[in-house]
Swiss-Prot record:
Record carries keyword Transmembrane: yes
Pfam families documented for this protein: BPD_transp_1
Protein name: Polygalacturonan/rhamnogalacturonan transport system permease protein YteP
Family: Belongs to the binding-protein-dependent transport system permease family.
Keyword field contains Transferase: no
GO cellular component term of the entry, any: plasma membrane
Start and end residues of each ABC transmembrane type-1 domain: 1-144
Domain of life per record: Bacteria
Main location (coarse class): membrane
């Protein structure tokens, strides 16, 4: 009798597990089309994001292409020590952090402001037109964006310089003046990317209950107060998530954009880790060293995301995990 009583909980546990598996299987069958929809994305991340992580090990090797990963000599932290003792390390760090600060302080609030303003537009056709207009640049490559800037800003025949001369000023060499590199960089980022983030915020705003605005109007609240007390709090969680992800890109500003603007006259303010990795890795063939720089950037980004996420949760926000 005692043996049967002792075995009862174990039998119940087995039955519970079987029922749980059965429910899971039924749920998978019911949602099979949803899983099929996300399958291509999962395959993409597996092949192009996770499998290449195997290459991280060459950051700890003196990698030789002919010997391969398994045949190359292990050197430990040699390449990381070289990076931190490199004379240009602090220059690269400074330039990267300055551009990131500009992104965070100037670019990040722009889509929020645009979304708030577009939400107040009552003419639907005009609203859609503006949304399309600011979103189109996102589909242009940085090559096209920078090329358009060159056409507008060139000293001889550039529209901007022609206007400056027309109003009595002197021509400015925007492209070869290091003082203009950062303003040009951030203006191009705003023009190309602001529309994408604006769409995200607008989607979040659509979830706000219209009755809240009606109640605010009855209480005498104007549009500015409605924005401040209703719309902004409603999209606060989205802002926090995008801010955390943005902080994770502190050292990841994007190679292509900066490299297209980089030249001999502005290198002191334009050289960042991304362009440095390209020069060391592809131009000079220092594969292990350039990988070590990439690992350093990824580690910093991961730490900052974790810290930002913890800070967000400390202040009562959801965070990203």
């Amino acid at each position: 009798m005692k043996t049967a009583e002792a075995q009862a909980p174990a039998v119940d546990a087995v039955i519970f597990k079987k029922e749980k598996r059965k429910r899971l299987l039924i749920k998978l069958i019911q949602q099979k089309y949803l899983y099929l929809m996300i399958l291509p994305g999962c395959i993409y991340f597996l092949l192009f994001k996770y499998v290449p992580m195997w290459g991280i090990v060459i950051a700890f090797q003196d990698y030789q292409p002919f010997l391969g990963i398994l045949g190359s000599e292990w050197v430990g932290l040699k390449h990381f020590i070289r990076l931190f003792t490199e004379p240009t390390f602090f220059l690269l760090l400074k330039n990267t952090l300055v551009l990131f600060a500009l992104n965070l302080a100037i670019f990040f609030p722009v889509p929020i402001l645009l979304a708030l303003l577009l939400n107040e537009v009552r003419i639907a056709l005009f609203k859609k037109f503006v949304q399309t207009l600011i979103y189109i640049p996102h589909f242009m490559s940085w090559v096209i964006v920078v090329s358009l800037s060159f056409v507008l800003l060139t000293v001889d025949g550039g529209l901007i310089n022609e206007l400056i001369v027309f109003f009595g000023g002197e021509k400015i060499n925007f492209l070869l003046n290091e003082e203009w590199f950062r303003p040009l960089y951030i203006l191009q980022v705003i023009w190309r990317e602001a529309g994408w983030s604006t769409i995200i915020y607008l989607a979040a705003i659509t979830a706000v209950d219209p009755q809240l605005y009606e109640a605010a109007k009855m209480d005498g609240a104007g549009r500015l107060r409605q924005m401040w007390h209703i719309t902004l709090p409603a999209i606060k969680s989205v802002i926090v998530v995008l801010l955390i992800l943005k902080i994770g890109d502190t050292l990841e500003l994007g190679f292509e954009h900066v490299y297209l603007l980089l030249n001999a006259t502005n290198r002191e303010v334009a050289e960042i880790f991304d362009t440095y990795v390209y020069t060391a890795g592809l131009k000079q063939g220092q594969f292990s060293y350039s990988t070590a720089v990439g690992v350093f950037k990824a580690a910093v980004g991961l730490i900052l995301v974790m810290l930002a996420n913890r800070l967000a949760k400390k202040f009562g926000e959801e965070g990203i995990y």
